[in-house]
Amino acid sequence: MSNISAKLVKELRERTGAGMMECKKALVAAAGDIEKAAEEMRISGQAKADKKASRVAAEGVIEVYAADGRAILLEINSETDFVARDETFKKFAQEAVKAAHAANAKTIEEVLAAKTSNGETVEEARKSLIAKIGENIQVRRVKTVEAETLGAYIHGSKIGVVAALEGGDEDLAKDVAMHVAAANPMVVSGDQVPADVVAKEKEIFTAQAKESGKPAEIIEKMIVGRIRKFLDEVALLGQDFVKDPAIKVEKLVKDKGAKVVNFIRLDVGEGIEKKEEDFAAEVMSQIKG
């Protein structure tokens, strides 16, 4: 059966998101049976997803969803920023984080098994998206946190932060989350900085201080002062608040009767070796699939 109506092709395209020619080819192979054609395209999509799984996906978005004292952050990667800006990709990411939150998912496996609003799993939606877009799409990281007060902040879809507080309100928690996105602290308080990191900094400061030629007791005071300054720079509570540098974050939360319990910050592509490509190459990769 080669006489396939345009209406049937259009319906299959709307259901699968695939191209017109691919839909017509599938309908011809299925003798006009749209259900069979859709199923064969899903199987084909699975094969395409498997083929693309080895390709580096270092672009993408961070999505955050917070409700009922629980927050979840997802990093979902694509191969190119071109796709990361695509509305279909963004919609998938938003559906995935909502589904993961509803399922109280804490691992990648649990995220992928979570059901989206249309009844399919995140994994099924991911593979369908790969077949449609033609890039490797990966749910790379999931982080969760529970607290009395939560504040979420996303910067340009590339940095996502959740601040967890005891006391205070959501506005305060959002301000803290925004600060974390901008200042990128290592820990909440100075006493949480790993001992080996402090030791390394002390070694560097000691060498620098000795070059000054000052007496030993002065050198010791210099080292203590520099270590204290270092801890303030890398610890959230010791940092100057980005919206009002005249006060420390510690004072900001204390004045509101709150305490910072934890924060989570995800940056798209952290730790992934990215392949440098120019825009023309990126567009060509889209055309070639």
UniProtKB/Swiss-Prot annotation:
Gene Ontology terms for molecular function: translation elongation factor activity
Predominant place of localization: cytoplasm
Ranges where the record places region Involved in Mg(2+) ion dislocation from EF-Tu: 80-83
Keywords noted in UniProt: Cytoplasm, Elongation factor, Protein biosynthesis
Any Pfam family hit: EF_TS
Record keyword Aminoacyl-tRNA synthetase present: no
GO cellular component: cytoplasm
InterPro entries (UniProt xref): EF-Ts_dimer_sf (IPR036402), Transl_elong_EFTs/EF1B (IPR001816), Transl_elong_EFTs/EF1B_dimer (IPR014039), Transl_elong_Ts_CS (IPR018101), UBA-like_sf (IPR009060)
Cell location: Cytoplasm
Function summary: Associates with the EF-Tu.GDP complex and induces the exchange of GDP to GTP. It remains bound to the aminoacyl-tRNA.EF-Tu.GTP complex up to the GTP hydrolysis stage on the ribosome.
PANTHER family, per the entry: ELONGATION FACTOR TS, ELONGATION FACTOR TS, MITOCHONDRIAL
HAMAP family reported in the protein's UniProt record: EF_Ts
Family: Belongs to the EF-Ts family.
Name of the protein in its database record: Elongation factor Ts
Organism from which the protein derives: Francisella tularensis subsp. holarctica (strain LVS)
